[in-house]
Amino acid sequence: MIDFSILLEAYFDCRRHKRKTVGATEFEMNYMSNLVQLLDEINSRQYKIGKSICFVVRYPRYREVFAGQFRDRIIHHYIALRLEPLFESQFSDRTYNCRKGKGQLAGIRQLQEDIMEVSENYTEDAYVMGIDLKGFFMSIYKPLLAKMVDDFIVRNYHGDDKEDLRWLCNMVVMHHPEKDCEKKSADYLWEFLPKEKSLFTNGEDRGVAIGNLFAQLFANFLLSKLDWKIDYYCKHHVRYVDDMVLVARRKETLLRLMPMIRETLASLGLRLNEKKFYFQHYSKGVRFVGAIIKRDRIYSVNNTINNFRKSVRKLNDAARYGDIEAISHAIQSVNSYLGIFGHYNEYGMKRQIIKEELDEEAWKFFVIKGHYRSVQLKKRYNIDMKYKNMANEILNHKTEERKDIPTENEISKMLDKGYELEMYIIDGRIHVECYPRDS
């Protein structure tokens, strides 16, 4: 049986950084009684996963995301607290996503060091092979993953709540959120998703919901089998989710690995994305998780630079109208990019774009800190924003609703596909209906 203290720990872990969300606030109002009820449901095997919300995000590409209720997310954190330490002891050091002390930047630095080591400080030839998986999260076969996780728990977990953990893991892995969900995005947005990219259309028992904590944890666990097989034949390799790069002195070393990689993936119900495969000399540069690694230097990919330019333009537009709230939001976006660029060799690019895109009048609202490390709203406007935000939080209760106003590009694509869009307003909210032209 699960002890109350364990569930309480999972609750505090779950609400961290999420305390102001509607679900967390409602649960916290009576969190002790809510936790007791949840505990009783689990121990009596009456617990059932609740309705999820589902929406489509547009940036950086169209993706379907599911989010469980807050009480269900507590269960996800309970599972992670129990299994993550055990998984960590068996993960390869060459896996960098969603792990403490790792991360995207650490993976990029490791790959740079690997290239330097294999090429003997850029004095010898070295080759890189990049591979990606096709529709990774949506291709995961649930029964196989559930069995692998259950076998792992049987062998490695020895807590008093072992049977509860097995029962809950099987439930969350085999759950079909698409069968009981509330769509927060307009239906027409699903038209931009390929069938294999949605749980609604990719086939029975295929896919785990992007957006839930356990998805990343169990995905790492699933691919750890491939990590260790690659590690046996090729010491220098890095993986971030389903993006992998291998480095070797000779071409043949890398090419001989392809049959083994395909065979291992097939045993897991996965396959390579042939369109994203590349094989080249290190001197041509290596693209990995949003960065271009070249000799002694790391750059951002063009998409990131273009998006940074767009964020600076939005800041300039907000400053032109003197909208302090819009300026504050735009500054957050600009600073997120400046934070990324601070780790790369991009000082000249940052300086050039900011100077090109910001009007002279815009500078009265903010200042640049350090060597283009961040943008900061001037103090007198910051104070105004503080009190305005306090008033808005009182007057307007925050919700999890999302804006689904179609962009001009989306409208054009839907019309080309033979659909018609009808937009109308109910209770001050914009609604969009999409239907075939012949209906």
PLM segments and residue spans:
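Short, conserved non-catalytic motifs in the polymerase core
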Residues: 17-25, 50-74, 90-102, 176, ...
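Amphipathic alpha-helical blocks
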Residues: 28-51
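Acidic, low-complexity, intrinsically disordered interaction modules
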Residues: 399, 406-407, 418, 423-426
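Active-site-proximal segment of RNA-dependent polymerases
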Residues: 80-141
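Conserved polymerase palm-domain catalytic core
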Residues: 41, 114, 119-241, 246-262, ...
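Short linear proline/tyrosine/threonine-rich motifs used for host-factor recruitment
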Residues: 394, 421-423, 430-436
